[in-house]
């Protein structure tokens, strides 16, 4: 029965296929292999898209949608792009999260019977970009696979991640708890995520394009073996991955997918890094956003810490900077080595110092990405010429580094890495033209002298006329026929023409080609050989050049690891030189590290804000076991958030390996940095501002340790005054008594300033400001002790709130203050022992205080709006009111 069904299905499929033209049958077969991908089908000088693909491409790429004929009764919708411009369209597609299969003609149209043979040669997806036209110079593109591990009860116990930068070949693995997935994805920022059905819902929204992959691709045993095969090792012990489970399953799925998109092996994936949470200072998504490391809160790339630090001379250095900022090591040893290298660069003599080194680095190509394209055999001619020129510049660069490296081991290590693989420079110099064409198909890529056959073909093509002149001269001398001519026409090709009176002198090797009335035309073996070459010389030269170029790529494959080593050394050297330039230009200093708990910053400055203003007020920050929490008060716009952020940024910069904006800085161990600064509704997640605020606070209270740095800004402001005050007090108390972390706690609840009376480890500081008339001048200086008021009305006035609103607010504020004084209900009771009040007293309403009419009148007026005569009249009015009491005024 099953056989009959199969036979019927095959017959139905054959009947359906017969309704299409042979070309459409070919297209539909290829499309069936890539159902979720836009198929770019090569037809002559265009890539065509058909049916639904054409409709989608026309919409996304703004192409003209046409309709030509029908296939199986269905109109064929078409859209196309020129083959020479396809990369720019692919770049647009991947930005939309789409993938494209590039289907090329691989058969010869002249010999093909039916449609020319076609094949998908590569698949372009958001996470597998390697072409320079599709990549941002200063950002990496990651393909990530996600595998959920389950315990015996079937409950998710861990999540394995594997992510690959295909352009460089860098592969990383990690295993983490399910609740850490969001933070990990926020840090990695993959362009594409591979997940099996059933695990896709684990991926937070907005984290990248999601591609469904068969569940069997994530098999752990198969993944482990595939990793070993890829790295050419017997086990993963040497990479620290022997204990991993779900991460190895993710790696297996990732390698299958990446190799399939490229249609070949991933020769440049030869190393593996297992990331452990304990290696780096923890930065949750909120902290990365609030500190504006690589992106502002508005979503722009500048001004950020990254944009300030990125004066790198190479794209490799810029990408490494981005990685370092998101991966600050916990161990201070790495940072100290970087500081030592920066110091050596700054102390070097001018002729061999920082400026000279950076000038040389500006001539360096993007070796990392060129190497990736080499490994995938997709490097273009100018990639190779850039690689050649870079390798040629390395000896001089190594000499400069060697002159500086005597006082810095890190520089010595980097200098040793700047040794091009043996034979590479010689091969590239001999093989590649000084200024090659952009594409191999254009010719002019292989250097003269590299291949005798190619040189001859080029000579034939370029110097055909000269060959004929030389041959004519030689044949006249050999035969003694003075009027012998060597010529060419399109009908008969090349020939030697001899007049009838001279035919008796024709040598035996002449073969008659054509007889004319007054002359005979001949061909010789030499001329025939030349003719065969000349008529196809250009075509054959291009084919020979293509073959030679492919041979050069193959010859470079064994040197991939050496090229990667050079790229890594260049990137780190460039970044350290950029750090040195920033330190010199912006007057930064080398921080110190200690094993003792504490943070000491002398005259610290916010690096990004300082670059935006003419003058920046530097401030000290001291946190230690006796001073674990700073309660920061002061007016809005007074600089509380800036002070808090600058403390975190200076600490982060120190551990990244940069010098810091301060007069001096000293840091104890730091394991994590938390921030609770600002908040907004999470509409997509159905969370209010206050819920977002409390969720972030809960994460801090649950995870902060005595080595964590916590920034809390106005916690509790998203709810009612007393609820917020109670929560802020309880949270501050918990941070002091349980977490015992370094804490900067900014608040407008002045009642909290009594906390140091209960906890000696807490201290009050404030951002100073002075009143000037009804205005305010922010001094931005951090001073000991609490602030005396918040200056809210003055800040509102600065913001442009209309004068009548300010006057009304002042009037109501005075009323509230008088009412509060009359009620005599001290707000500080929140921290004092509870006072027992008799029930009748609690039910008696307080007497309402009546403000003096003169004060009310003063609060109503705006001195800036008064004319001289009005002011005089008002003065008499106020004098009268002042002499009378409230009761008299009411009468």
Curated annotation (Swiss-Prot):
As for family, the record states: Belongs to the DNA mismatch repair MutS family.
Q: Is Ligase included in the keywords of this UniProt record?
A: no
Biological process annotations from GO = mismatch repair
Quote the Gene3D superfamilies the UniProt record gives.
1.10.1420.10, 6.10.140.430, DNA repair protein MutS, domain I, MutS, connector domain, P-loop containing nucleotide triphosphate hydrolases
Q: What is this protein called?
A: DNA mismatch repair protein MutS
State what this protein does: This protein is involved in the repair of mismatches in DNA. It is possible that it carries out the mismatch recognition step. This protein has a weak ATPase activity.
Among InterPro entries, the record links this protein to: DNA_mismatch_repair_MutS, DNA_mismatch_repair_MutS-lik_N, DNA_mismatch_repair_MutS/MSH, DNA_mismatch_repair_MutS_C, DNA_mismatch_repair_MutS_clamp, DNA_mismatch_repair_MutS_core, DNA_mismatch_repair_MutS_N, DNA_mismatch_repair_MutS_sf
Its organism's taxonomic lineage begins at: Bacteria, Pseudomonadati, Pseudomonadota, Betaproteobacteria, Burkholderiales
Q: Which GO terms describe its cellular component?
A: cytosol
- Record's superkingdom? Bacteria
Keyword Transmembrane helix among UniProt keywords: no
């Amino acid at each position: 029965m099953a056989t009959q069904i199969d036979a019927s299905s095959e017959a139905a499929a054959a009947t359906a296929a017969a309704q299409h033209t042979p070309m459409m049958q070919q297209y539909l077969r290829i499309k069936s292999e890539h159902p979720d991908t836009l198929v770019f089908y090569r037809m002559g000088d265009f890539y065509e898209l058909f049916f639904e693909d054409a409709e989608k491409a026309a919409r996304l790429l703004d192409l003209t949608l046409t309709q030509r004929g029908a296939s199986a009764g269905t109109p064929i919708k078409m859209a196309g792009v020129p083959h020479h411009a396809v990369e720019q369209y692919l770049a647009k597609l991947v930005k939309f999260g789409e993938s494209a299969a590039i289907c090329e003609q691989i058969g010869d149209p002249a010999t093909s019977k039916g449609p020319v043979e076609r094949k998908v040669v590569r698949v372009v997806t958001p996470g597998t970009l390697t072409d320079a036209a599709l990549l941002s110079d200063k950002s990496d593109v990651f393909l990530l696979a996600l595998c959920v591990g389950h315990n015996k009860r079937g409950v998710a116990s861990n999540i394995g991640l594997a992510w690959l930068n295909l352009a460089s070949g860098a592969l990383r693995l990690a295993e983490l708890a399910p609740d850490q997935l969001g933070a990990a994805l926020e840090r990695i920022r993959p362009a594409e995520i591979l997940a099996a059905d059933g695990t896709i819902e684990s991926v937070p929204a907005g984290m990248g394009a999601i591609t469904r992959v068969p569940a069997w691709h994530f098999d752990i045993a198969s993944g482990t073996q595939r990793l070993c095969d890829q790295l050419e090792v017997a086990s993963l012990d040497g990479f620290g991955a022997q204990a991993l489970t779900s991460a190895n399953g993710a790696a297996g799925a990732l390698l299958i997918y990446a190799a399939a998109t490229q249609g070949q092996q991933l020769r440049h994936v030869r190393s593996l890094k297992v990331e452990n949470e304990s290696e780096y200072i923890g930065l949750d998504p909120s902290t990365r956003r609030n500190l504006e490391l690589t992106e502002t809160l508005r979503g722009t790339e500048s001004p950020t810490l990254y944009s300030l630090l990125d004066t790198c001379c190479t794209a490799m250095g810029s990408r490494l900077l981005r990685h370092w900022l998101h991966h600050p090591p916990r161990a201070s040893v790495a940072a100290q080595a970087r500081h030592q290298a920066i110091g050596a660069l700054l102390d070097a003599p001018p002729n061999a110092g920082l400026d000279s080194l950076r000038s040389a680095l500006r001539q360096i190509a993007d070796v990392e990405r060129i190497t990736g394209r080499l490994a995938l055999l997709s490097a273009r001619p100018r990639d190779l010429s850039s690689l050649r020129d870079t390798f040629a510049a390395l000896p001089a660069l190594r000499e400069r580094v060697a002159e500086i490296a005597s006082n810095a081991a890190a520089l010595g290590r980097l200098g040793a890495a700047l040794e091009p693989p043996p034979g590479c420079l010689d091969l590239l110099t001999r093989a590649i033209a000084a200024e090659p064409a952009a594409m191999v198909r254009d010719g002019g890529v292989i250097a003269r002298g590299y291949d005798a056959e190619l040189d001859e073909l080029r000579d034939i093509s370029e110097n055909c006329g000269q060959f004929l002149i030389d041959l004519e001269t030689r044949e006249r001398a050999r035969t003694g026929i003075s009027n012998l001519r060597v010529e060419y026409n399109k009908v008969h090709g090349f020939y030697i023409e001899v007049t009838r009176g001279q035919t008796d002198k024709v040598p035996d090797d002449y073969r008659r080609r054509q007889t004319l009335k007054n002359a005979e035309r001949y061909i010789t073996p030499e001329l025939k050989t030349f003719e065969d070459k000349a008529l196809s010389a250009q075509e054959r030269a291009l084919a020979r050049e293509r073959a030679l170029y492919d041979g050069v790529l193959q010859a470079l494959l064994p040197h991939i690891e050496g090229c990667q080593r050079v790229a890594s050394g260049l990137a780190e050297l460039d970044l350290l030189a950029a750090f040195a330039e920033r330190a010199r230009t912006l007057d930064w200093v080398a921080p110190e590290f200690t094993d003792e708990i504490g943070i000491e910053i002398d005259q610290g400055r916010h690096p990004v804000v300082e670059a935006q203003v003419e003058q920046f007020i530097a401030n000290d920050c001291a946190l230690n076991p006796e001073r674990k929490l700073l309660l920061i008060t002061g007016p809005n716009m007074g600089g509380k958030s800036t002070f808090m952020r600058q403390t975190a940024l200076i600490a982060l910069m120190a551990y990244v390996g940069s010098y810091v904006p301060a007069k001096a800085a000293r840091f104890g161990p730091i394991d994590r940095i938390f921030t609770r600064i600002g908040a907004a509704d999470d509409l997509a997640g159905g969370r209010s501002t206050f819920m977002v605020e409390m969720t972030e606070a809960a994460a801090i209270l649950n995870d902060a340790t005595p080595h964590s740095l916590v920034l809390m800004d106005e916690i509790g402001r998203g709810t009612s005054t007393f609820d917020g005050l109670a929560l802020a007090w309880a949270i501050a108390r918990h941070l002091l008594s349980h977490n015992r972390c370094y804490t900067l706690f900014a608040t407008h609840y002045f009642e909290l300033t009594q906390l140091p009376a209960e906890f000696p480890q807490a201290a009050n500081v404030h951002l100073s400001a002075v009143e000037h008339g009804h205005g305010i001048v922010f001094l931005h200086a951090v001073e000991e002790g609490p602030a005396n008021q918040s200056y809210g009305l003055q800040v509102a006035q600065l913001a442009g709130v209309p004068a009548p609103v300010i006057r009304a607010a002042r009037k109501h504020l005075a009323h509230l203050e008088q009412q509060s004084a009359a009620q005599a209900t001290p707000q500080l009771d929140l921290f004092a022992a509870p006072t027992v009040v008799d029930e009748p007293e609690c039910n008696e309403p307080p007497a309402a205080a009546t403000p003096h009419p003169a004060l009310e009148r003063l609060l109503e007026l705006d001195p800036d709006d008064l004319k001289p005569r009005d002011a005089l009249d008002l003065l008499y009015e106020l004098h009268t009111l002042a002499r009378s009491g409230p009761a008299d005024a009411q009468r």
